[in-house]
Amino acid sequence: MGVVFAFGFYLIFIKLTGLKLMDYFPRFKENRLKMIFSILSVILAFLINWLIMKNFSFLIEIIHPIASVWIFIILIYLLLRFLFLKRVPLSNYEKKFMGNMSAIAIFLELLKIIEYVDEHNIASPITVALVFFIPVVVFFNCKYFYEMELSS
């Protein structure tokens, strides 16, 4: 099961971003960052698999900080690009990577909301959704404004 889980994360983090592991070896110096991301994604897959096997509730507790940090990093990256590289459009790799990061962050936030609602028996899931989705909405607004700024 661990190998299947790791392969699934390999597909999510590597294949969906348009990367191929075999492309790194002929020109490793040019693609060091992509190689590091691929290695880290496989390590993350095994770590998450181990956490699921050991204690699922511990996994739920780390989901929200991971998603929040990803959203925060993406916002800072977009802000820095907007401030210093106004005329440089996002590359296809950056667009795919940011789209996948935001989709994974939203998925992790949804898992946290479901866990929070189940734990506290909240009558109004709308309140919980508003509290947890504010960073996601801010991220998407910043992304669309940034894209509009580049296209004008």
From Swiss-Prot:
Q: Give the transmembrane ranges.
A: 2-22, 33-53, 58-78, 97-117, 122-142
User: What is the topology of this protein in the membrane according to its UniProt annotation?
Assistant: Multi-pass membrane protein
Location comes to:
Cell membrane
Q: Which UniProt keywords apply?
A: Cell membrane, Membrane, Transmembrane, Transmembrane helix
Any one GO CC term of this protein is: plasma membrane
* Primary location class: membrane
State the superkingdom: Archaea
Protein name (database record): Uncharacterized protein MJ1358
Q: What taxonomic lineage is listed for the species of origin?
A: Archaea, Methanobacteriati, Methanobacteriota, Methanomada group, Methanococci
